[in-house]
Every structure is written in C-alpha cells, then in structure tokens.
C-alpha cells in the first residue's frame, strides 16, 4: 500500500495536489485530524488489498496538532506502516499574490497582514518540511505543471497512457444532446437506413444496417477524418490533465446511423489500445415511445 501524507503552506497547492492524486487512483481524505491517522491506516490495511493507494491532507497549523502528527507518525513507523510526506511550498511573494487574488484571509493572520501569517506558518512547518520525502515548490508552476509533477512522483508510469477513459456515446438529437458530452458530432448528413424498408426495423448494431451505412464513400471519409482528429486530440487532452472524454455521435433518433458510426469509432480506438467504453443511449427510445422517424 502507498500511503501519502500531503501538507504544506496555505496557498501552495494542497487542494490541487489531492485532486491530482485522486485522478491517479488514490483514496483521498482532506483535513483528517492527525490523531486519527493510526486508526485510519489500520482500517485501510484491513481491506485486504481493496485500497492500495491512500492520500491524506493534514492541516497542522496549531501547536497541539504538531505533537499529534509526530506521535501518529511514530506509531505508524513502530507498527511497520510505510508512509511518505509530500510538502507543498511556494515563495512569500507568490503566496501573497495568491491570497490577494482569491481575497481569502490567511488562517494565521488575525491582524490581516498576510506576510505575518505566512512567516508564522513557515516557522511552524519547518520540522515537517525537514521530514518530507518529496517537496514541490509551486511558485513557478501552473496547475497543469503541478499535476505533471504529481504524476511524475506518484503515477504508475507503465499505465499512464491508459488513464484517459473514453466513452463513445450514440444518441438521437430529437431526445436531446447528452449533457456530459465533451465532443458532439452530427451524422444526420449520412444516408438514412430508416427509409430502406428491409432495414428500418433493425438498429445500427445489426450487420445489415452497419454494412449499409458504411458502404458509402462519404461515411468512410468522415470516419477516417474523425479518427485522425481523435488521434491528435486524445494525447493533447491527456497532456492537459483530462482523465475522461465523452464523444457523442448523434443522428435523428439515435437508432441507426449514430449507432453504426459510434461502433466504428469505438472499434478503431480499442484497436489502438485506448481504454474505451461504448453506450447507445437512445437505441430503443423510439420503440418504447412508439416514435416513427429514426
């Protein structure tokens, strides 16, 4: 089990760090009191491997919390629990700028002087920083760059290319565009099997309908160009930190053309090693509602 304790200066990026760890599959808990760390660790280890990666954000500004944290860390070491400390740091100038931009009050500056609060917190956290296994200074890092730094330290690099989960979703425009779509493609320009008497009753999952849709030159040109575009977009989406991508493909009713095209795109992505799911949202919608045009 990998057990990471995340701490550091206020405004240095702890919230973004925990989000990045969550994207990497860590079970994350924010602001757990240090006294509860031993019991939490024991509970996680007793899951028999169901929880393999844990990250805790610990807020230890108060003096009593320091004693509690060091006692808890001592207990973990004595009991054989391995842990790592990730410390987030930043320069005074950058922290002041971030607090001013967010219009937040520093938690240790009751007099309103941000710099005084930062100085006090920096002194209190010095011993924790000295014990840290990894220190990330976020002064010059954008959100994406911090995420990349987290991935470099805590990511499973042999699996990183598969962390973007793709869903190819067919739908019918008459039933509404899926609200969670990232990309939407309209295939109503393709020849419609609905108007072919012997195909009307079938769906795009049936070979005879799929063969009909894919038999046209315009269909193959569209699929090829869409695949080329996805080959360009997917690695760039991942580079920017995206972990889920929903590609929605729509026709009129969501039963014939969109289903056939979605299946073609799904198979193409799958053959390239992507982690991809397929869903035909409206394939039976018109049958259930007694609709006509598909």
UniProtKB/Swiss-Prot annotation:
One of its GO terms (molecular function) is GTP binding. InterPro entries: P-loop_NTPase, RapZ-like, RapZ-like_N, RapZ_C. Belongs to the RapZ-like family. Keywords: ATP-binding, GTP-binding, Nucleotide-binding. It comes from Clostridium botulinum (strain Langeland / NCTC 10281 / Type F). This is Nucleotide-binding protein CLI_3561. The keyword Nucleotide-binding applies. Displays ATPase and GTPase activities.
């Amino acid at each position: 089990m990998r057990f990471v304790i995340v701490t550091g200066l206020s405004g240095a990026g702890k919230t973004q760090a925990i989000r990045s760890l969550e994207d990497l599959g860590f079970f994350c808990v924010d602001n757990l009191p240090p006294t509860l760390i031993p019991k939490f660790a024991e509970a996680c280890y007793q899951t028999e491997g169901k929880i393999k990666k844990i990250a805790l954000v610990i807020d230890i500004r108060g003096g009593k919390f320091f004693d509690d944290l060091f006692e808890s860390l001592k207990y973990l070491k004595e009991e054989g629990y391995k842990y790592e400390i990730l410390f987030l740091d930043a320069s005074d100038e950058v922290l002041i700028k971030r607090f001013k931009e967010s219009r937040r009050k520093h938690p240790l500056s009751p007099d309103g002087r941000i710099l005084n609060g930062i100085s006090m917190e920096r002194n209190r956290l010095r011993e924790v920083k000295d014990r840290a296994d990894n220190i990330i200074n976020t002064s010059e890092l954008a959100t994406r760059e911090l995420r990349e730094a987290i991935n470099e330290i805590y990511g499973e690099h042999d699996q990183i290319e598969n962390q973007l989960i793709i869903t190819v979703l067919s739908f019918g425009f008459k039933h509404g565009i899926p609200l969670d779509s990232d990309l939407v493609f309209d295939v109503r320009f393709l020849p419609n099997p609905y108007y072919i008497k012997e195909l009307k009753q079938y769906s795009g999952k049936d070979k005879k309908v799929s063969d009909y849709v894919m038999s046209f030159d315009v269909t193959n040109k569209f699929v090829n160009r869409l695949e080329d575009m996805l080959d360009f977009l997917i690695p760039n989406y991942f580079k920017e930190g995206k972990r889920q991508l929903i590609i929605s493909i729509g026709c009129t009713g969501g039963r014939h053309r969109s289903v056939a095209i979605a299946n073609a795109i799904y198979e193409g992505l799958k053959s390239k090693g992507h982690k991809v799911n397929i869903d035909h949202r409206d394939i039976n919608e018109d049958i259930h509602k007694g609709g006509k045009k598909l």
